[in-house]
Amino acid sequence: MKRALILFAALAIPTAAAGHHGWSSYDTEQVLRLDARFTSVSWSNPHGHATMTYRGKQWHVVLAPVARMEARGLTPAMIAPGKRVQLVGYPRKDGTTEMRIERLTAEGKTVELR
């Protein structure tokens, strides 16, 4: 039983880590610069998330870890749903309506998220 558990952990942990840090799935050649309003925000780890409407579709937005956003002066109130934000980021290569944000400006403050 102990061997099975060790084998499971050895196989599962790298898979989870690779999925979590799959930044190569974003198209860094296609930079999106958007003026938007989030429709929802999740201030949580391992990364904050938000949703917004862009080109008539609902997009999932991947932010930075909460500790990094807070250390750089970003607060949940600054990006609350309905508030205007400017985003610079990359869309997914597979066409999924999701983008990874590199830079966010809210209430006149620009924050580098990566």
Predicted regions and their residues:
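Short nucleic-acid-contacting surface segments enriched for D/E, G, S/T with interspersed K/R
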Residues: 70-87
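Short boundary/loop segments of OB/S1/cold-shock single-stranded nucleic-acid-binding domains
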Residues: 17-32
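Conserved hydrophobic positions within beta-strands
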Residues: 36-38
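OB-fold/S1-family single-stranded nucleic acid-binding modules
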Residues: 92-114
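A short macromolecule-binding patch
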Residues: 57-66
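Positively charged n-region of N-terminal signal peptides that target proteins for export
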Residues: 1-4
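Short aromatic-glycine-enriched beta-strand elements
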Residues: 44-53
